[in-house]
C-alpha cells in the first residue's frame, strides 16, 4: 500500500454501532452490489483492480486468482458498517493470499469532527516542515560554480569586447555611477547593482563599489566561496578592470559576470593597429587624443635563424590617433632575421631599434658570463681600468710590506738569538744545558769575555785607548797645577805590589794572545774577579755575593748584551735597564728583599729560581760544567776541571789558568772570523 503524497492516512474504524449506523444502508447496498459486479466481470484476469472513484480514497487492489472467490466488502469510508474492518483485515491477512493495494490520498473533506482535527494536524506538520526547510536554506550560503566546458577558453574572455559593449563596460567597471539613486535601488548582495554602503569598506568610493571591495555577507563568516564568486582570474585582460596584487579582477554582481562570459571571440581575430587604437584609458570615459600614441599589441613570430636581431618598434611620429578612444597597451616586439651588426642601430625611416640576438643552438651555457666580462676583440688595446690598477697597487704594496717584515724579522731573530737560546735553556734539564754550553764555542768565549773582534774593532779600540790616555794626562796635569796653586795636599793612589805583578802578567799574556786590555779598567776587573777578597772564596762558591758585586756583574753583563740585544726594560726604582722582562722581575726583588724560592735541603731562600737550582746542585755534588772539549780539527783543549755551576766555570776562564785553557778555542774563532773578512 503506497500513498502518492508520502503521508500516511488515518482510517478510523470503530465497533460502535451508533457511529456505524449514521450512513444510509441503501447506499451501502448499492455500492456493494456495484462492486460485486465489477469483481465478477474481471474474475477471468490474473489480477483484479477495484477503482473506488466515488470515494475520497482510490484503492487499487490486486490479488491472486486463487483467492478471487472470497467475498470482500468494498465500502471504505469513515462511516462504513462493521464489515469494513473485517474485510480490510481479510485483505491484509497473510492467510488470504498475497495482495497489493495502491491508495492515492486525494482529500479528506468529511463533515465529522475527528476528520477535521486530522486535517489541521497535517497542515500544522506541513507548515513546520516548510519552516525548517526555509531555515536550513537561510543558513546555507548560495554559491555559484562556474565550470569550464570543452568549448570554453580563457582566451575568449581575454580578447577585447566589441564596440557595442565597450562603452557600457568601461563606464560600469571603472567610473563611478553618476545616475545613482539610493531609494530606487536595492542594497542586497544578490541585486543587480549592489551599491551597498558599509563602514567595512573604504570611504573613497561613493556609492560603494564592490569591484574594489566586495560587501561582507551577514549569512557567512568570511566564507571563501563568496570571494571566489566575485573574483575572476584574468591574468592580463583588456577590459581595463582594476587588478589586485594577486592578479584577480573583481565583479560586483551576476550580470557583470554574464557580460564577461558571454563575450566569446576566436583566437584568430587579432586586432590590428587601427582597431586597437580605438581603446582608451577610460577612467572618466573620455581621454585627450594628443596624450596617447599609436601603440599596438602584436607578436610576430618568425623562425629562429642562425643570426637574428630583435626589432623594438618605437613610434616616432607624434600625430594623434584618428580615433577618439585609445588605450595604452604593450608595444610590438617582433623577431626578424638580419645578417650583420653588433650594436643596436636605429632606423630613422620606420623608427625601429635593431638588437642582435644570438642563436640559441650555438649559444652554450658556458658563455653566460660573457655579459659580465668584455670581449677580447673589443678591448685588445685598452689599458686596465682604475679599479684594476688600484687592486694591483694594493697587491704590490702588500708584497713590499711582506718583504720588509721578513727582513725585520730576520734581523730581530739574529739579535734575539741569545735571548731565545737562554729561554730555551730554562726549559731544558740541567744536564742538557751543561752539554749545550760545552758544545757552544761562542757561549764559552762570552763567559770568558774573550769574543774575537775584527780589525776595525781593534783599530777603534786603539783609537779610543789613545784618546783616553791623552785625556787622562791632560786632566792630571791640570789637576796638579790647580792643587799646587791652591796649596792642597793630595795623595796619589797606591797600588799594591801583588796587584801590579798580576796586571803585568796579564799584560804580557794579552800581548801573546792578541788581547787588548785597558789597565785603567782593571779596578772593575779586580772587583769582578775578587782578587782582594781571598777570604770569600767559599762564599763565592756558595753564591753569597754582596749586592754591590752583583750589581757590578749585572752591569758587565748588560754591557756585553747591549751589543746584540737592546735594553728596553728599565727599573722604576734605580733606572737600570735589562734586555729581558725576567731579569727585570728578578732585579725588582732585590729592592724589596723578596726571596720566594727556598732550598728544600737547607732552607736557604733565593730571589731567583735558577739560583736555587744551582744551590741545590751543590748539595747533590753534581758537577756538570767541564773546562775542556775538542776543536774542529780534533785537538783537545782545556784542563778538564768540573764545576757545579756555569758562573763558576766562567770565573775559572777569567783566571790565569783559565785563560790558558780557553786560548786554543779563542784562536780558532779569531782565525775563522779573519778568514771570513778577507
UniProtKB/Swiss-Prot annotation:
Q: Where are the transmembrane segments?
A: none
PTM Phosphoserine: at which residues? 175, 245, 385
Where does this protein have compositionally biased stretches of type Polar residues? 1-21, 166-195
Give GO BP annotations, semicolon-separated: cellular hyperosmotic salinity response; cellular response to alkaline pH; cellular response to blue light; cellular response to calcium ion; cellular response to pheromone; chitin biosynthetic process; intracellular potassium ion homeostasis; monoatomic ion homeostasis
Please state where this protein is localized: Nucleus; Cytoplasm
Q: Give start-end positions of each zinc finger (C2H2-type).
A: 569-591, 597-619
Record field: compositional bias (Low complexity) = 34-47, 410-428, 472-486
Phosphoprotein as UniProt keyword: yes
User: Which domain of life does this protein belong to?
Assistant: Eukaryota
| Single annotated GO MF | sequence-specific DNA binding
Kindly state one GO CC term assigned in the UniProt record: nucleus
Keyword set for this entry? Cytoplasm, DNA-binding, Metal-binding, Nucleus, Phosphoprotein, Repeat, Transcription, Transcription regulation, Zinc, Zinc-finger
Sequence segments annotated as region (Disordered): 1-50, 159-195, 401-486
Q: Does the keyword Zinc apply?
A: yes
Q: Which Pfam families match?
A: zf-C2H2
Predominant location: nucleus
Q: Where is the composition biased (Basic and acidic residues)?
A: 429-446, 457-467
- PANTHER family named in the record: PROTEIN ESCARGOT, ZINC FINGER PROTEIN
Role, per record? Involved in the regulation of calcium ion homeostasis. Binds to the calcineurin-dependent response element. Transcriptionally regulates PMC1, PMR1, PMR2A and FKS2.
Q: What's the protein called, per UniProt?
A: Transcriptional regulator CRZ1
Which organism is the protein's source? Saccharomyces cerevisiae (strain ATCC 204508 / S288c) (Baker's yeast)
